[in-house]
Each structure stands twice: as C-alpha cells, then as structure tokens.
C-alpha cells in the first residue's frame, strides 16, 4: 500500500504541475449550494440515511453535507466498508440531491474521536499530541508520519471508491478534509516529534508569504515564543498535512476541496479555542501551506454573522459557510451571503434535528434562491453582466445605503416603518435580509424577507430631509419614531437635479432560464404610493422593480 501511495503522490505532482489545471476560482464556480449539514451521528446506519434524505429534499435543499466516518469505513485495519457511502449516494440520486462528504478522519472538532479503535489503542505507533506539561491529548499528532499514512490510506481508498461510483455522474460535488482542525489545551503540540520540528528552520515560502525578510530562522527567531507564535507554527504543520491529503484527492477524483474552521470567538486565547485551524487570521499560513485546498470556510455560530462572513470573503477564497446555527434567521442569512458575496453556498448544521419553524424559513429562502440562481450563480452568463448585493438587518443594525452609480438604494429593516405593531410593541425583531440583483439600467430584483428599499439619485438624497412617519404613513408631529426620506423641509430651498421614481413593483417567480413570470403588482399601500419596495417580516418574495427618472 505504501508503494501505491508513493505512485499516487508522483502522479499527483505531475497532475498538479500542469498548466491546464483549474484554478480554485474556476473549480468552485459551479457551486451553488443550498445546503444543510446532518448532525454528526445521523448517517451511521443505512436506516438513518434512508429516513433522513427524503426530509432534506422536502426542505428544498439541493445539497446535503454528510459525514464519512473513518472508524466505520475501516473498522479493521486494511479492511474497508463503504456501505454507508454507497447508501448516501443512492438516496441522494433518488431525491435529486447533491452530496458534500465530510472526511471525519484523524481529526473532528480537534479530537481524534473518529479514528478507528485499532488506531486509538496503538499510541506507540500513532502518537498523541501533548501539552507543554507532557499531558497526552485525544488528538493524534500531526507530526507523526505513521498517523498521516494511516489517515491517508483510508482517505485514498475513500476517494478511489467515490471515483468508481460517481465519476461522470457528479452526485458528489465537494469534499471537506477533516473537520474543524485545531489544538486544544495548548496552542501547539509539544510531543517529541513536534519539539524536533519546532527547533528546525521556518520554510522559506512561509517567511516570504508573511513578509519576513530574514531566511534561515527558527520558529522562535522568526515569530517569537508566545502563544500566537506557537499557533503559527502549528497552523503551518496542520496545513502541510492537509495539503498532502488534498493532493491525493485531486489526483484520484478531481473536485472542489475545502477545510472548515471553528471560530476564535469570545476573547479566547490560542489553546482556549481550536487553535491553528484555517482561521481568518491564519489565512496566509494556510493558503501558503495548503495551496491545493480551494476554500477556507467558517463555521459561524456566534453573534456577528456579517463580520465573520466578511473575514472569509477574500481574494482567492470564495466564501462557503458549511456550518451555521440553524434558527429562524437562517433563511435571510442565506440570502445575504448569496447576494453580497455570490457565495459557493450556505448550510445550517444539524438540519435533521431542526424545528419546523426553523426549517420553514430556510425552505422559503431556498425556494427564492433556487429561482435566483440564473442571476446569482458564478457559472451563469448573467453573472458577467449584473451586479448583486446582500442586505441583512436586525434590531441594532437597521440600514444600509448601496451606491449604484448615481443611484442610491436606501435599504432598511421593514420594522423601521411604524405601521406594523410588532415594530414598536417590544416584540424582538426577526432578522430581515435579501439578495438584490441589478438586471438592467434602473431595474432590480429583490429576493428576501423583512426589508424595505427606497431608490434615490445622489443629488436627490443630498437634498432630502428625513420625515418621521406615523402608523398611518403620513408625517408624524413631535419626536421622530421612524423615518422615510423625503425632499423638502420647512425652509424653502430650490431643488436641483433629477429624481428617481418607481415605475412599478411586481411580485414575480423566475424560470430556470431567468425568465420573469408575473404574479401580481404591488401598488398603492403595498409600495407606499410609489415611495419604496418592501417585503414584510416573515413574508418571502421576489420583487421586480422598474425605475424611471423625472
């Protein structure tokens, strides 16, 4: 088997060096994942797989993220069982779904809990990472060649099996390598093998990538000796480990590859969160160390969704969110990332365990996004012509102004308008969000929920005075409670320039080729007599807005 791996490595080097090789951008451009990730144990039997896959189709997913378990794939060393993989692929095809397999190999959420028992028991051959005090961890050491070879043999057989079953069909659309790699209890591994590597020289390519001038330095000389320096050291070696697996995958069955990261949130220091994984502040290290991996992807569970997403929308790193807290706001968050970043996809975690109120919102959002695919997918010719944006609001983040040439799109949460009693009665605001696409001059699609959008020229906006509105839609006297832009004030000023007006607002559906199908017209009270386009909270619509100037 070792000779086989060596042959694969040689072929991989030749394959990866060819100039015809696809870039990460090209390879991931076909992805438009309206996904959901199964809970960790939801695919451990064929009965579970048979039960869960029909439910995923009913939620309007187009892709299911499914674990591939090393311990169940190779329960006895050298003997492989792919029955769970085969059943997943079969059920996906039956329900017209794509699959992203998650390789739960040497590490899952930092730990080596999905390694087979024969691997776990033989700590002499497959050593553990250690803290600085010498405490062994339930984490296989990334510095052990034996650990890598065992993981790689199983991963290689897994990829070979996928190629045999799926090449030319394409049910499997992407592979996640390991799961939330990272060190815990210490910022780096202090095992004997790790200490030997730490005393060595920093690779020249990493020093160059990080803007370090001096070559031939040790890790301590180049980066210092604190926990942040330890994290850089560990990140490099995790990345190099993953790169070797990625090269095997690329050679055996070429498809998009990514690694996911648990966020370093809540003020924790390295060692207190899963350190050295593909985190945003380590993106340079990971991109240098694992160039064959197409995407570094965030698992977002904490507050500040927009901020976390922005950190991973980097040049050469298409945004994909493989895990996010499944909640009633998941739907508008999906609309936001697909509109703002033309993301590769969005996938709430434990979708099989979600409550109906949570999956209902996600299903409605995915129904809109599936229709918007001709306008949002990076592989669509329309992406070469039209711009798109995403908006996402809550009770504290209520407005965004988008500049599109001389036109401003003044976007706000729907509850900034006062006539819905939920806006002012103390009810917590649901998040509102949308994907907005410009399909022609002065012509837009808005797909979302809980948003209101005004359209004004820049000169008009500069001369506008905010007028607080009452629940009847007219100017409110006294202290402002909510506002909508208006031209004019109590003082007389001469207006200059042109104004933007709404020609019409239509509710539409969209066919697979991008053709708009008229459903109904929103006018009068539904667009505030031509002042804005809006979609109510917990309503889900696609609006086609045509503007004019006067």
Regions found by a protein language model. Give the residues of each.
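Aromatic- and carboxylate-lined catalytic core of secreted/periplasmic carbohydrate-active enzymes
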Residues: 335-461, 470-473, 477
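Bacterial N-terminal signal peptides
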Residues: 7-17
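C-terminal beta-sandwich/jelly-roll accessory domains of carbohydrate-active enzymes
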Residues: 420-429, 444-550
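The substrate-binding groove and active-site-proximal loops of carbohydrate-active enzymes
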Residues: 33-45, 67-85, 132-153, 165, ...
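N-terminal carbohydrate-binding accessory modules
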Residues: 20-62, 94
């Amino acid at each position: 088997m070792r000779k086989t791996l060596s042959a694969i490595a040689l072929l991989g080097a030749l394959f990866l060096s060819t100039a015809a090789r696809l870039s990460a951008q090209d390879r991931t451009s076909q992805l438009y994942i309206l996904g959901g990730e199964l809970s960790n144990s939801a695919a451990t039997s064929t009965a579970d797989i048979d039960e869960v896959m029909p439910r995923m189709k009913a939620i309007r997913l187009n892709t299911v993220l499914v674990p591939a378990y090393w311990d169940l794939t190779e329960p006895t060393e050298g003997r492989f069982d792919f029955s769970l993989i085969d059943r997943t692929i079969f059920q996906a095809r039956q329900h017209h779904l794509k699959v992203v397999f998650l390789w739960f190999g040497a590490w899952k959420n930092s730990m080596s809990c999905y390694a087979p028992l024969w691997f776990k028991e033989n700590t002499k051959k497959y050593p553990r990472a250690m803290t600085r005090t010498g405490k062994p961890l339930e984490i296989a050491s990334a510095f052990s060649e034996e650990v890598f070879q065992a993981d790689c043999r199983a991963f290689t057989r897994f990829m070979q099996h996928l190629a045999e079953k799926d090449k030319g069909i394409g049910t499997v659309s992407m592979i996640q390598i390991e799961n939330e790699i990272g060190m815990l209890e210490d910022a780096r591994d202090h095992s004997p093998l790790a200490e030997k590597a730490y005393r060595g020289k920093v690779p020249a390519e990493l020093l160059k990538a990080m803007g370090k001038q001096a070559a031939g330095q040790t890790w301590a000389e180049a980066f210092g000796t604190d926990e942040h320096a330890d994290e850089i050291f560990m990140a490099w070696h995790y990345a190099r480990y993953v790169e070797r697996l990625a090269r095997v995958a690329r050679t055996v069955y070429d498809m998009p590859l990514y690694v996911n990261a648990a966020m370093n949130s809540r003020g924790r220091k390295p060692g207190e969160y899963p350190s050295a994984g593909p985190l945003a502040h380590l993106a340079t290290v990971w991109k240098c160390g694992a160039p064959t991996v197409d995407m570094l992807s965030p698992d977002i569970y904490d507050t500040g969704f927009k901020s976390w997403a922005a950190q991973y929308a980097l040049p050469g790193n298409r945004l994909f969110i493989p895990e996010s807290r499944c909640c009633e706001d998941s739907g508008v968050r999906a609309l936001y990332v697909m509109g703002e970043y033309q993301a590769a996809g969005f996938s709430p975690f434990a979708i099989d365990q979600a409550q109906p109120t949570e999956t209902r919102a996600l299903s409605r959002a995915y129904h809109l996004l599936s229709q918007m695919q001709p306008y949002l997918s990076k592989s669509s010719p329309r992406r070469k012509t039209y711009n798109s944006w995403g908006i996402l609001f809550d009770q504290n983040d209520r407005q965004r102004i988008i500049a599109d040439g001389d036109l401003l799109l003044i976007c706000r949460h729907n509850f900034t308008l006062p006539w819905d009693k939920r806006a002012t009665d103390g009810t917590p605001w649901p998040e509102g969000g949308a994907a907005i696409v410009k399909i022609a001059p002065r012509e837009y699609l808005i797909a979302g929920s809980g948003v209101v959008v005004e359209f004004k020229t820049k000169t008009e906006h500069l001369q506008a005075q905010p007028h607080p509105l009452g629940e009847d839609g007219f100017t409110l006297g006294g202290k402002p409670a909510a506002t909508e832009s208006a031209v004019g004030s109590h003082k007389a000023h001469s207006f200059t320039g042109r104004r933007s007006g709404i020609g019409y607002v239509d509710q539409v559906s969209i066919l697979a080729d991008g053709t708009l199908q008229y459903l109904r017209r929103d006018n009068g009270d539904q667009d505030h007599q031509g002042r804005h386009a809006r979609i109510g909270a917990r309503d889900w619509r696609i609006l086609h807005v045509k503007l004019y100037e006067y």
